[in-house]
Design a protein with these regions (language model features):
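Metal-cofactor-dependent catalytic cores
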Residues: 1-268
Length: 268
């Protein structure tokens, strides 16, 4: 069963939890529709490089009006760390406003870059593909997705991680999924999503997803956001017990409206 649905209007900012949303081959309508672009480098601002962009987690973005299929992306409201709000359709100086808070020159853009890319910082943790290094990473053209349009996570994976590292606060918002599915898996299938890769998943009556691969995690899941503390132990646990993966990526084979409470059926 679908227990929560999440959309992030601006890449790497906190997003919004939804009761329902339309899903197309480009993911949840409006997800990662905007991003901040570093005026110095031209790269997408991403909390994957917290040395530059950790403050992004102090911002929250929501749509003023719900985005609709086949319509222009609506404007957004951004709540700044001090609680004040700015509106993309009203504040002519929004780039200056955001740049001043972040301490770097940025401009707010929609997802229309032909070759978007971002920087990723790899901490010195055993099991990561790189260690103590910053790399440049390409993104799919004209999107602000890292790899895939949908990230799916199960409750059983979160619960298992809590058992493995009880000192850590494993909460859904650390992992920024689009869809959270209730699961009671146990034993050898603690990370049950691993066995879903390559299979189809039907949600509700209309939606069909193809699970395309594991979601490899990065330093973002260790960063503070709201009342969640900084904790490198989160990433260390994920690296030690599940090859740095939490959840899976998916493509959309057939779209439709997804609701909280929808049934979820995995193909045999």
């Amino acid at each position: 069963m679908v227990v929560s649905i999440w959309r992030y209007p601006v890449k790497s900012m906190l997003g919004e939890e939804l009761n329902s949303s339309y899903l197309t081959e480009r993911g949840l309508v409006g997800d990662r529709a905007y991003a901040l672009i570093d005026q110095e480098t031209g790269k997408v601002a991403s909390a994957k490089n917290p040395r530059k962009w950790e403050k992004l987690f102090d911002f929250r973005s929501v749509f003023i009006d719900p985005p609709q299929v086949a319509e222009n992306i609506p404007p957004i409201r951004i709540t700044l760390p001090n609680g004040t709000q700015t509106f993309s359709d009203q504040d002519k100086d929004i780039d200056y406003t955001l740049s001043k808070v972040l301490g770097r020159g940025v401009r707010l853009m929609k997802a229309n870059l032909d070759k978007p890319s971002y920087e990723e910082y790899w901490p010195d943790i055993e099991g990561l593909a790189q260690r103590e290094k910053v790399t440049d990473e390409a993104m799919p053209p004209r999107t602000f997705f890292d790899i895939a349009v949908i990230h799916l996570l199960t409750t059983s994976t979160i619960n298992r991680l809590r058992e493995l590292y009880p000192e850590g606060r494993f909460e859904v918002r650390r992992f920024r999924p689009n869809i959270v599915v209730e699961s009671t898996a146990s034993g050898e299938k603690d990370f049950i999503e691993n066995s879903w890769i390559g299979k189809k998943l039907t949600i509700g009556e209309d939606i069909v997803l193809r699970i395309t691969g594991p979601c490899t995690r990065c330093v973002m899941i260790t960063l503070p956001q709201g009342d969640l503390p900084r904790d490198l132990g989160i990433l260390c646990t994920v690296a030690k017990y599940n090859q740095v993966n939490v959840g899976v990526y998916a493509s959309v084979l057939h779209g439709g409206t997804i609701h909280r409470g929808d049934s979820v059926l995995l193909e045999a």
